Amino acid sequence: MKNAVRLFQTGLISLAGVLLSATAIAHPHMWIDGKVDLQFDAQGQLVAVGQQWEFDEMFSSYARQGLPNNAGPAALQAELDKIGNQWIQALADPMSHYFTTLSQGNTRLAVGQAQSVKVSWNPKTERLALRFELPLLEPVTAKKSPITVSVVDPTYFVAYSFEAPDAITTPTAPANCKAAYLPPATLDNTTAQRLAALPPDQGNLPPDLARIAQTLEHRIELKCP
């Protein structure tokens, strides 16, 4: 499965191939600081999951190649929107589906195509950020059982972090709802070295590494008792 390669089809593989540093030729190849905000309707039901992915400086610099340096804000945003549309189309691939799953108990919750897609550039940090929202096809309540949001790239091409104090927010949640962040498992040194040895064009992971990669999911558990 080359979902992570398809995700950023603007040339990440080319970037990994031409850079000679050790970090450029090891899994993972991209680092994202993520944020999740859970959105509710007036009845207290979860209706959408908003996400922001802030990309590392190396990928941000590469993705901005070719953009006009002296363009005004409107022209620059138009170019960034084009990039965002390319990324979100790749992310919509059924095999990756935004690297995000929602579930309640043993039931997977269906979500629609990403909406409110926007790419922004922060000149202070020199990083690009992708913002999008995933609407649930049917609103759902967490009164009887928790709802879990999971974010992971099963090929470990992309590594996520949700360490910021405001990484998980519920601005429109009912007062009784609480969202808890459950971090992924920690890789042991041997597994980390095996992943680091994989080439940038590696698609499917070996079966044992694929199983381990699944344990690296970042989970947000919503409870509304």
Over which residues does each language-model region extend?
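Bacterial N-terminal signal peptides that target proteins for export
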Residues: 2-12
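Mature, soluble, non-transmembrane domains
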Residues: 104-225
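N-terminal signal peptide c-region/cleavage motif recognized by signal peptidases
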Residues: 21-23
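Short solvent-exposed loop/turn micro-motifs enriched in small/polar/acidic residues
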Residues: 31, 93-95, 215
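Early extracytoplasmic/domain-onset interaction patches
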Residues: 29-61
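Short, hydrophobic/aromatic beta-strand segments
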Residues: 48, 61-65, 142-148
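A short, amphipathic edge element
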Residues: 28-34, 109-114
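Structured domain cores in non-transmembrane regions
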Residues: 58-140
